[in-house]
Each structure stands twice: as structure tokens, then as C-alpha cells.
Amino acid sequence: MEEFQRYIELDRSWQHNFFYPLIFQEYIYGFAYDHGLNKSILLENAGDKKYSLLIVKRLITRMYQQNHLILSDKNSNQNDFFGHKHKKNLYYQMISEGFAVIVEIPFSLLLISSLEAKEKKIVKSNNLRSIHSIFPFFEDKFLHLNYALEILIPYPIHLEILVQTLRYWVKDASSLHLLRFFLYEYRNCNSLITPPKSISIFSKSNQRLFLFLYNFHVCEYESLFVFLCNQSSHLRSISFGALLERIYFYGKLEYLVKVKTFTKYLRVILWFFKDPFLHYVRYRGKSILTSKGTSFLMHKWKYYLINFWQSRFSLWSQPRRIYINPLSKHSLDFMGFFSSVRLNSSVVRSQMVENSFLIDNPIKKFDTIVRIIPLVGSLAKAKFCNVLGHPISKSVWTDLLDSDIIDRFGRICRNLSHYYSGSSRKKSLYQIKYILRLSCARTLARKHKSTVRAFLKRLGSEFLEEFFTEEERILSLILPRDSSISRRFYRGPIWYLDIFCIHDLVNDE
């Protein structure tokens, strides 16, 4: 990244947020090629594997040539038409990957520079980057909250919304025109060979570019939403005129004109949004908004979000995509866990003179449970078991060495144990470990043309214990087993703050 930053510093176009000149810089595509971009995409000739740095630039030039892009089935047979269309799909995939690299790297450099500036003022903590840091936050906050909004963030229904979001950051019109032209042409290209119901701009073939655009769109929405939430704690002391001036830039003019007619009711409406105990977390396309307020307040936030998306981002979200759930009666489905607040009863006997009586003290406890059914479904999809959870052999691995088979199963099992170590109840995790352990034994037995019973009897069951390491065994290397601190760690959930994303823990091939 340092050597790449040196190239961009030499290019004065990026200093003014101009992307278009970067499209024609060869080191951009060389950087993408060297860092694991799908290498077969940027090959001039797949036969001799000769790499060409000019292919994407040529395709961009061709994309502006209407005679090359506009296809007609006149004077051509059916096979030639579809062959040409599939070839055109490949061209758009190449441009998509190249454009994704171009827009990712400068924004990454902006992030790095901002972090370097903040390091001088704040203490750097890598633990806060972990997605598991959300759950200690839940443990600390959920016990004092009442309601939660489970929000499914809507996808943009129009491609122009994605382009308009970038408009505030990208200064050159040429890049925006190229991106807009590419998105519309790619959609039209797919519509000719793909049924309309199956068209998705977030397809796997172009996932990198569209995920970047979607994440950037969500971050833009969150920055405005957090700003408005921060202002809500001061709404009592702000007059309508001052408040209108502060949010004027973030709202549409016609929407604000409509609001102005309700001036005399605005103070009352805004008072209901005053909530100092409001917390917001998100991962991917799902977010959770928790509050200590009442059910009426949560309904206000629900319809506020719907109007906020519609008026500011032109997104239509149906009310059923936002669920209002009391934390005392409902479990939150988030990041592979069912999280809930459970009441534990603690009975204490009290003695006063000659009379004794029992005092029942309910104590709230944060509880996390592994979602066993989706996890078994993922294992079944990866051919480790059937849909009922019965272990089967992994036939595609029978050609590997025994050590490689054991290592693959062990790595998957350790990843699952590492990620789900914070579960309050380990029974579901033990079931997953049993499926993987028996699947490994069946795979080895199938390779050696033997039965599982005979194979385990010949080698012994101890050969599997090396890689199915329990979390307690890891902790025993850090803390003495007989210490009181260690005993509390063994009983309670353990969150590892070195997990930065949810990997495909099952299909770890």
C-alpha cells in the first residue's frame, strides 16, 4: 500500500478527487492483478496466459462506441447472438473489476490518512475493530434497555441512487458518467439473456463493485442518521427555526415545506424522539436500534426511519421490514446468535427476630445461543451431513493425504469453536463438533475402504483429539485451573476480539 500510495501522490488528479484519469493508469490494473483479483478476467489470451494491462482501457473505449455495444438479432442466428451476448457479459465483468479497484483504493487511502491523524489524539485499540466487540457491548447495555428495532436495510431499487450517493465525494463528472453508463448498459445486457425475476445487480460475478457501492450508500445513510440521533438529545432546547436551519442541507426542500405547515405541533412530535439511551449497531444489511423508551416511542422511530429513507434517499421500505420487539420476551437474531435477556431468580432467606421469610430477587442476564438449524443447513450444503444432521463422508476429499483431511476438518472445527465461544449454552456447539468429527472419520474410512468402527479400532479415537481443541484447554495455558478467575472464565462466555468478519466457516476449502 505504501508503494501504491506513492503513485497516487504523483498523480495530481486524485488530489482533486478526479477518478477518470486513474482509469487509464496501468499501475492500477497491475496492482489489482498482484493482489488476488480474478486473474483470468484480465488475460488477453487465456491460452498462453499473457497478461495485458491495456484490455480494460480498450473495453472502456469500446463501450462508448454504440456500434459495438448495440446488438441486434437481425441477420444473425440464435447461437451467434447468445455467444456475442455472453462475450459482452465477460467484457462488463472485466470493467467492473477494474473500476472496483479504482474506487476502493483512493477511499482506503483517505481512511488510512484519517486514522493516522486520529492516532495522535486517541489511543489505538485494534480490539474495537472486531465484530465480536458488539457482544460485550450488548452484555453491558441490554440489561438496562426495554425495546429493540430489528431493521432490514432496504436495497436501492434504482441504480441512479448509487451514482447520486457518490456524487458528493467524486468531483469529476466523467467518472460518474462512465459509472452510470456502465451500470445501465450492464443491466440492459443482462435483461436480454436473463429472466427479469432473476436479475440482481449484486450478483456474484460483479459482487466487488456493487458491494462497495452498497456499503458506501449505507455509510452515507448512517452518517446522517447518527447526526440526527445526536441532535435528538437536545431537541427540547432548540427552537423550530434553529433546528430547521441545522438539518436544511440534509433534507429535500419540498419535504421541509410540508413539515413547516405543522410548526405548532413540531415541538410535541420532536419531544417524543428525545431518548438519551439510544444505541445502534449494524452488520451487513441488518441493524438493531435499542432504547429504554416505551413501545410508543419505538413506533415513532420506526415510521421516522421509513420517512427518512423515502424523503432523503428515495428508498421505499415496507413497515414489516422493521420489527419492534421487547427485549424481555424476544431473542434477537444477529450474526449467527440468538441474543436475549433472561431473568434468573435468586432466592435469599432473611431472618428478622423470630420470623424468617424468603426474598425472590430476579437478576437479568444476557444470554447467547448458537443458531443450530442454519448451521446444520450450511454443513449439509457443504456435504458434511444430510439435511437431518446425520454425518456423511466428504467424498471430494478422499484423494487427499490423511494429514490434509484431518487438517481441513480440524481447521473448520477450530474456526467454529473460536467464533461461537461466546455462546452461553455449549450443547449446540458440541452437536456441530460431533457432526464434523464423525464426518472426518467416515471420510478417512471411505478412503481406506473400511468401516468407521474398524478404522477407529485400528488407529484409536485419540488421533482426532489433536485438532478438536476445546476452548478450556486453550485457557488452561493462560490461567491456572484452580484459580477463582479461571473458574469464572470456564463457566461464562468468551469473546475473542481478533475476528474481523464472518467467514464462510463451513465451506473452508
Swiss-Prot record:
It comes from the Eukaryota. Keywords: Chloroplast, mRNA processing, Plastid, RNA-binding, tRNA processing. This is Maturase K. HAMAP family: MatK. One of its GO terms (cellular component) is chloroplast. Signal peptide: none annotated. Its main location: plastid. GO terms for molecular function: RNA binding. The gene is matK. Pfam families: Intron_maturas2, MatK_N.
